[in-house]
Design a protein with these regions (language model features):
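N-terminal export signals
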Residues: 1-24
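Conserved, mostly hydrophobic/aromatic
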Residues: 56, 112, 125, 176, ...
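Shared catalytic-loop signature of beta/alpha-barrel
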Residues: 71-72, 79, 84-87, 91, ...
Length: 429
């Protein structure tokens, strides 16, 4: 039996046949593609970025829909991008990654990274999930962290009614996340003396402290009312903080154990907390069988190292638009999987370009993936300026993965131009 090598096989063929074989197996060379410009426009309240190349291919990324103040920071990175090949995603990211930071300052770097993957996929004629190693699932589960009717009040019956309506939503969500405790300012003002400190204004999620017995009981009563409605048909996760003291966090988590909640999120740190506090989370996790979750505010893989290696939590929830992008998220998810830690990407405000990035990322994540937080277009007219999304987007709690090149979504340019401010009128030029 002959053991043919590829070189030996080709040498044994007639010249014409060998030429034909090579032309079929080796890609035609193309001119090196280069970044020529970086643009940023505020569409609605979302900073949307466009990376422009010398071959007429552009890539798009988006920061969260309330971060319009990030535009100058996005443009700060322009000088570090010009002239580089955008398909060498990691090489380009090495120029800028170290200049990001915890939420909200990682968003600019993350949006740029996502736009680079969009270009890489378009150049290759492949969906982004292929660039990330290929998909292991044809549909991806989402959870509802923000599509909810207005609460009529802050009593347990109001929360029960709210999740009943969410349970009946046409999207068929199999997992719902509700804000409680310090993550829910209205709940904490529902009755007097929920905790011992005074309410703080200013930046978001500024309150923390020691809960009163009344406060603890009210949060638990609202949680129990929601769980009674959802039963085991729809999972219930809670966005809790940041703000709990460790003793209150342990008390609350232990009280939740019989309810088998999907997770308790950000009890100790979270939104706008510029540190992970792995040791404290490890103490919490070891004190309860409830599922402990954190990670949305954390930037970069190095800042997840202690949480993962100390097995300080059960679930990590980085946001692709804050952590450094989808490639960065995938690295973290794979390392977490080695330590039996699940992932559930955060992303309620990531917008419709962000939604596309989530779908491609989730398709390629390892089997520790639970679900990602379903982003929505804000304002509603965003659905009129983007094409390429399935209709309906969510079916029975899942989104089907699409195969169009790049992120697979594009702007309806004329409709989008009508939403640009005069300052950003040249964004699509």
């Amino acid at each position: 039996m002959n053991n043919w090598t590829r070189r030996g096989l080709i040498s044994a063929l007639p010249a014409a046949a060998a030429t034909r074989l090579l032309s079929q197996t080796l890609p035609a060379s193309r001119p090196k593609i280069k970044i020529t410009d970086l643009k940023c426009a505020i569409i609605g309240k979302s900073p949307v970025i466009r990376i422009v190349t010398d071959q007429g291919i552009s890539g798009f990324g988006q920061a969260e829909s309330y971060k319009e103040y990030l535009k100058p920071m996005v443009m700060f990175y322009k000088k570090y991008l010009i002239g580089h090949d955008p398909t060498d995603v990691e090489h380009v990211m090495m120029q800028i990654r170290r200049m990001g930071a915890f939420k909200p300052w990682g968003a600019a770097v993350s949006a740029i990274e996502i736009a680079l993957w969009d270009i890489a996929g378009k150049v290759a004629g492949q969906p982004v999930y292929k660039m990330l190693g290929g998909k292991i699932r044809d549909r991806v589960r989402v959870y509802n962290g923000g599509f909810r009717p207005p609460l009529k009040g802050q009593m347990p019956r109001d929360y029960a009614e709210n999740v009943q309506q969410m349970k009946e939503a046409k999207e068929g969500y199999t997992l719902i996340k509700m804000a409680v405790g310090f993550h829910n300012g209205n709940m904490m003002k529902a009755i007097p003396d929920m905790w011992y400190d005074e309410p703080r204004g200013g930046t978001a999620h500024a309150n923390k402290g020691v809960l009163t017995e009344r406060g603890m009981n009210h949060i638990l009563a609202c949680t129990e009312a929601m769980k009674k409605v959802l039963g085991d048909q729809v999972g219930l996760a809670l966005d809790c903080g940041p703000g709990f003291m460790i003793k209150d966090a342990i008390t609350f988590a232990r009280a939740c154990e019989p309810m088998r909640l999907t997770w308790l999120e950000d009890l100790l740190t979270g939104d706008y907390t510029p540190y992970p506090n792995a040791d404290l989370y490890r103490d919490l996790k070891q004190a309860t069988s409830a599922t402990i979750h954190t990670g949305e505010q954390i930037y970069n893989r190095q800042n997840f190292k202690d949480l993962i290696e100390k097995q300080a939590v059960d679930v990590l929830g980085p946001d692709p638009e804050d952590v450094g992008g989808i490639g960065e998220f995938k690295w973290i998810a794979e390392y977490a999987d080695l330590h039996s830690i699940a992932v559930a990407p955060h992303g309620i405000f990531d917008g419709l370009i962000g939604l596309a990035a989530h779908v491609h990322l989730a398709a390629a994540l390892p089997q520790n993936f639970i679900a990602f937080e379903y982003p929505y277009g804000q304002p509603e007219w965003w659905y009129d300026i983007i094409e390429g999304l399935p209709n309906p987007i969510v079916k029975k709690g899942f989104i089907d993965v699409w195969d169009a090149p790049g992120l697979g979504v594009n702007f309806r340019v004329n409709a989008a131009k009508a939403r640009l401010s005069p300052e950003d009128s040249g964004f699509f030029d």
